[in-house]
């Protein structure tokens, strides 16, 4: 088995020059030592052991599959212990986001949400969808809500079908957001007509989150 020194030497020798690590998508490695030896994890797998799930970047089918799989896995590990979903996302696909949303409501553990950086569009919707009393944002995080975006091409009848679907999704999202924030649907509709950016404190006052966290409790 490779020892700690060898592993660190290997990682150092493979370190990219000119700050290319992020561009190459390299993930930090954590080494744990136990009575049975040493074991290495990528940082996200190690945090998953602590029931922390990351949703970072665009919300798409791949993101949804990963988040849903982790939520279901953690439920199977312990159905009574909370799961933490950390969000830094500009939003994305409504259908992918709704797959995550439905799974958050479906699993037995409470899913706590925390915004770090930005939770916009579907990211903000999922932030607000966390368990009541367990929705957080860091002090300098930003939250943005708006109506779903869509574009349609083709024949007039096809465009009409797509327009009806967008209107349905807007109405559905507005009702769900009203449920999670305590705002009435009419206000949600007004406030999401255009991009609506909020500070953490504004998001708390609006009902999108419950707490602004400056320190871990």
Curated annotation (Swiss-Prot):
Enzyme class: hydrolase
SUPFAM superfamilies per record: ClpP/crotonase
UniProt-annotated location(s): Cytoplasm
GO cellular component, one term: endopeptidase Clp complex
Claim: Protein transport is one of the keywords in the record: no
HAMAP family for this protein: ClpP (MF_00444)
Name listed for the protein in its UniProt record: ATP-dependent Clp protease proteolytic subunit
Organism from which the protein derives: Burkholderia pseudomallei (strain K96243)
Gene name linked to the record: clpP
